[in-house]
Amino acid sequence: MILVWGNSLQGQEVSRGRLGILLGGMNGVSYDYALTDHLEVGGTAAFVLGLGYGGSSKSFQFDGLTPLLELAPRYYFSRREEGQSFNKGGYLSLRLGAQIDDWRLFPSKAGQESNVKSHYTLGMAPTFGWSFPLSSKSYLRLGIGLLFYRAKKSHAGDSYYAGQSYWVTTQRLSDAPFLLDIGYGIAL
């Protein structure tokens, strides 16, 4: 009985891990591992494109590329088909990330001249999205979520508070910024 069960498992074994390249809102490398036909865990090392809409300035803002490490379990509503490289369809995800704001590339002029410096940010974002396979080796992923964060900041310049650091966190649900995820992935 055990030998038959063991042989049937070996016959069904498919590659569950996938190394890839991400382009879009996050630009870097990812590794996704399918735990089941519905559940996968993804890890990402990337540069995040700092785009946003300023509520007070009523304008779009660019704030450079920030290094990010992210872990994101995703539950797909549709079942992963045999031989398919990517899950497709709707998913729920809990994205956990850490970004190092001090290492930002191409920071905005406003960010460089600001008296408040951001050092690093820890975030959690429940996300709903949709994944579209474009070919056997690529996909397009679109998602939206709410970002809950905790950021380490400090005062700079010649002010009385210069050098003092403090934490900024999401205080209320209404303060949580929307997280838009638009990404193109290619399996290696």
Regions from the PLM with identified roles:
Residues 58-99:
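Mid-chain, structured segments of secreted extracytoplasmic proteins
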Residues 15-17, 23-25, 63-69, 118-124, ...:
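Residues that define the transmembrane beta-barrel architecture of outer-membrane proteins
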Residues 17-23, 43-45, 71, 92-96, ...:
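Membrane-embedded beta-strand positions of outer-membrane beta-barrel proteins
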Residues 9-16, 38, 78-90, 134-138:
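Short loop/turn motifs that connect adjacent beta-strands in outer-membrane beta-barrel proteins
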Residues 51-63, 98-121, 151-173:
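Flexible, solvent-exposed loop segments that connect beta-strands
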Residues 2-10:
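C-terminal segment of classical bacterial N-terminal signal peptides
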Residues 67-78, 174-188:
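Outer-membrane beta-barrel "beta-signal"
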Residues 9-60, 64-65, 101-103, 181-188:
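Short glycine/proline- and aromatic-enriched beta-strand/turn motifs that initiate or cap beta-hairpins
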